[in-house]
From Swiss-Prot:
Main location class: secreted
Disulfide bonds: 3-22, 8-27, 12-29
Pfam families attached to this UniProt entry: Toxin_2 (PF00451)
Species of provenance: Centruroides bonito
Subcellular location(s) of the protein: Secreted
Stated name of the protein: Potassium channel toxin alpha-KTx 10.6
Biological role stated in the UniProt entry: Blocks human voltage-gated potassium (Kv) channels Kv1.2/KCNA2 and Kv1.3/KCNA3. Does not block human Kv1.1 at 100nM concentration.
Tissue: Expressed by the venom gland.
InterPro entries: Scorpion_toxin-like_sf, Scorpion_toxinS_K_inh
SUPFAM superfamilies found in the cross-reference section: Scorpion toxin-like
Family of the protein in this entry: Belongs to the short scorpion toxin superfamily. Potassium channel inhibitor family. Alpha-KTx 10 subfamily.
Residues with site note (Aromatic residue of the functional dyad): 30
Keyword Secreted set for record: yes
UniProt keyword annotations, A-Z: Disulfide bond, Ion channel impairing toxin, Neurotoxin, Potassium channel impairing toxin, Secreted, Toxin, Voltage-gated potassium channel impairing toxin
């Protein structure tokens, strides 16, 4: 799957994280 920054960020925020970033085409969530 291709990681889309906007989608990833929104997804992470919905799950209670502060932000999301694409790393090696994977969505990673960050609490800060």
């Amino acid at each position: 799957t291709v990681c889309v920054y906007r989608t990833c960020d929104k997804d992470c925020k919905r799950r209670g994280y502060r932000s999301g970033k694409c790393i090696n085409n994977a969505c990673k969530c960050y609490p800060y």
